[in-house]
Curated annotation (Swiss-Prot):
Species the sequence originates in: Fowlpox virus (strain NVSL)
Pfam families, sorted: Ank_2, Ank_3, PRANC
Keyword match Mitochondrion: no
Disulfide topology: none
Gene3D superfamilies cross-referenced by the UniProt entry: Ankyrin repeat-containing domain
Positions of ANK repeats: 5-34, 37-66, 68-96, 99-128, 130-158, 162-191, 195-225, 229-258, 262-291, 295-324, 326-355, 359-389, 394-423
Identification of the protein by name: Putative ankyrin repeat protein FPV024
Keywords per UniProt: ANK repeat, Repeat
């Protein structure tokens, strides 16, 4: 009978568990020139869990270590303790790694306490588990088996090739019982210099329960540890929106002002995420709302950029400085939101209104040329925006921008602030000459101011800007007609006499003595302007309004002064003389002092 036929018969008898037939084939018929031929039958017998056949094969020369697949691994997978003992007694290698698995690792994965204990008793090295299997074992092994490993003197501080220790992987796997067990058995939380285990940060990044963090802090993990990016646990729990952990860390005195490699604090991350709760917690625990540098925006800038009004108000309430240096000035950031309420809030808290952005533009210029609603420009001007401030790049003024954008509303607004119509840009152009075509309405507004300025100040001829304006008008027939109309109307206004000394022209200049203008407020020719006045009507009306306001202030101040003991007995005409010497601000102070 050929060996192939005998081999098949041997495999068949092993599968049928026929020990006598196995003995008969091997002892009587099957002569082996190569004992390795019994390796396959041995593995088959182990797989069949037939310990008697396995013992017989081993006694007759089967070599455990010649099998293609280790019989010991198979026995462990089957959970056959006696088979494991038999194989080990016959020389099975208890450290042999097959398909990435050692016998001890397989026993642990199968959670077979008996086999685990036996392998350890026979000298299996438990430390190879932590060196070779990293975090693979931590979710597979119950706490009781870890206790066995500790009993057999496993090193709790051993490092694998990544320089990670068992406690690191226990934290990574969020295994509270194991973390507690390791710490109770003196696992070290000290991180050697140059290593990056960062236990608390690892706990936060892997969504550990708050109880784990509390345990780690109890055993001495520093709450302000920083990783390779110089971030702390606070940075990571803020980024993940974990408010309970954030509160815990802050209660344990975590520093909210540590900056990472990007120079960002936890507060930067909280505001960037629009996280009101985290922002509040950090500020209440001392986070600096005014940290700033050249790398990252201020927290207030970030809140404004996010259009988060709640955060803006919160930061301002806690003292955020609206004038901190940043990559993009706060006022420009607020303008970008196109939200009038945000702009108003930061202006109300002292934001610098006359500051250039990175392109060298002023806030007022931006508001005009980007076609924002006129209320934005009005607000900026009310808070002190300089209507004559030039851009750094081309030296255009807001009036240049308004005319280039053909914005009648902006031109009218700027003119009401007595803007300089003679300002020239880098190319030598005034607002009037900076564009080829201007509408009649805008041209009339500008030219009427030029004509009026000339009447007031003959030295204008010395200004380059005035010369440029006159040259522009002289080269444009339409402009010349407008100038002629302005000159004719001014002549008509001068001919409207209010008395032997003054004409209606005194109302053309708001800087004239208001005390004189007040006397003519009720004059019929002032109350009802002539129909011939159209171009300069707004100038006169503006002056009338300011004079009316001053008249009321003087009248009210005299009336309220009757309650002031020092001057209540002063004759009324003297009181008028006194009040006329005061400016409007002083008059308001008198009224307010009595009202209090």
């Amino acid at each position: 009978m050929g060996n192939e036929k005998l081999r098949k018969d041997l495999h068949r008898t092993i599968r049928t568990r026929d020990l006598n037939a196995v003995k008969h084939i091997i002892l009587k018929k099957y002569t082996f020139s190569n004992k390795n031929a019994l390796s396959t039958p041995l593995y088959l017998a182990v797989s069949n869990s037939d310990i008697d056949i396995v013992k017989f094969l081993l006694d007759n020369g089967a070599d455990i270590n010649k099998c293609k697949s280790p019989p010991l691994h198979k026995a462990i997978n089957l959970g056959n303790v006696e088979m494991v003992k038999l194989l080990v007694d016959h020389g099975a290698d208890i450290e042999k790694v097959y398909l990435g698995n050692s016998p001890l690792y397989l026993a642990l994965c199968k959670r077979n306490t008996n086999i685990t204990k036996y392998l350890l008793e026979r000298g299996a090295d438990p430390n190879t588990l932590f060196i070779n299997y990293c975090d693979a074992i931590y979710n597979k092994i119950p706490i009781d088996i870890f206790k066995i490993l500790i009993k057999y003197k496993v090193s709790l501080n051993i490092q694998n090739s990544h320089f990670k220790t068992p406690i690191y992987y226990a934290i990574k796997c969020t295994n509270y019982p194991l973390i507690k067990l390791l710490l109770e058995n003196n696992a070290s939380l000290t991180i050697p210099e140059g290593y990056n285990n960062h236990y608390l940060i690892t706990a936060v990044k892997h969504n550990c329960d708050i109880s784990i963090l509390r345990l780690l802090i109890k055993y001495g993990v520093p709450v302000n540890e920083q990783d390779d990016l110089e971030r702390t646990s606070l940075h990571y729990c803020v980024s993940a929106g974990k408010h309970d952990i954030l509160k815990l860390l802050l209660d344990y005195d975590a520093d909210p002002n540590i900056t990472d490699s990007c120079l960002g604090t936890p507060l930067h991350y909280a505001v960037s995420r629009n996280d009101i709760i985290a922002t509040t917690l950090l500020i209440e625990k001392g986070a600096n709302v005014n940290i700033h540098n050249d790398t990252i925006d201020t927290v207030l800038n970030i809140a404004v950029g996010n259009r988060n009004k709640i955060l803006i108000n919160l930061l301002l309430m806690y003292g955020a400085n609206t004038r901190l240096k940043s990559r993009n000035p706060l006022i420009h950031k607020a303008l970008e939101t196109k939200d009038i309420n945000i702009l108003s809030e930061i202006l109300n808290h002292g934001a610098e209104v006359n500051i250039y952005n990175r392109e060298g533009y002023t806030p007022l210029y931006i508001a005009i040329i980007t076609f924002m609603q006129i209320k934005f420009a009005k607000l900026l001007l009310r808070y002190g925006s300089n209507p004559n401030m030039k851009n750094e790049s081309n030296e255009n003024t807001p009036l240049h921008g308004a005319i280039l954008s053909n914005r009648l509303d902006s031109v009218e607004l700027l003119m009401s602030y007595n803007v300089d119509v003679h300002s020239i840009n880098k190319l030598g152009h005034t607002p009037l000459s900076c564009i080829n075509y201007i509408s009649d309405k805008i041209a009339t507004i500008i030219i009427s101011k030029i004509v009026l300025d000339l009447e007031k100040d003959s030295n204008l001829f010395l200004l380059d800007g005035f010369k440029a304006n006159i040259e522009c008008i002289d080269q444009n027939d339409r402009f010349k007609v407008i100038r002629k109309n302005c000159e004719d109307e001014l002549k008509s206004i001068r001919n409207i006499k209010l008395n032997h000394r003054y004409s209606l022209s005194i109302f053309l200049h708001s800087d004239n003595n208001n005390n004189i203008l007040i006397r003519f407020l009720n004059h019929p020719k002032v109350e009802k302007l002539s129909s011939c006045i159209s171009i300069y009507k707004k100038y006169i009306q503006k002056t009338k309004l300011s004079s009316s306001i001053r008249y009321k202030l003087i009248h009210d101040a005299i009336e309220y002064s009757n309650n002031i003991s020092m001057i209540n007995s002063v004759p009324i005409n003297v009181k008028y003389m006194i009040m006329e010497m005061l400016d409007n601000k002083d008059l308001k102070s008198i009224i307010d002092s009595v009202n209090k």
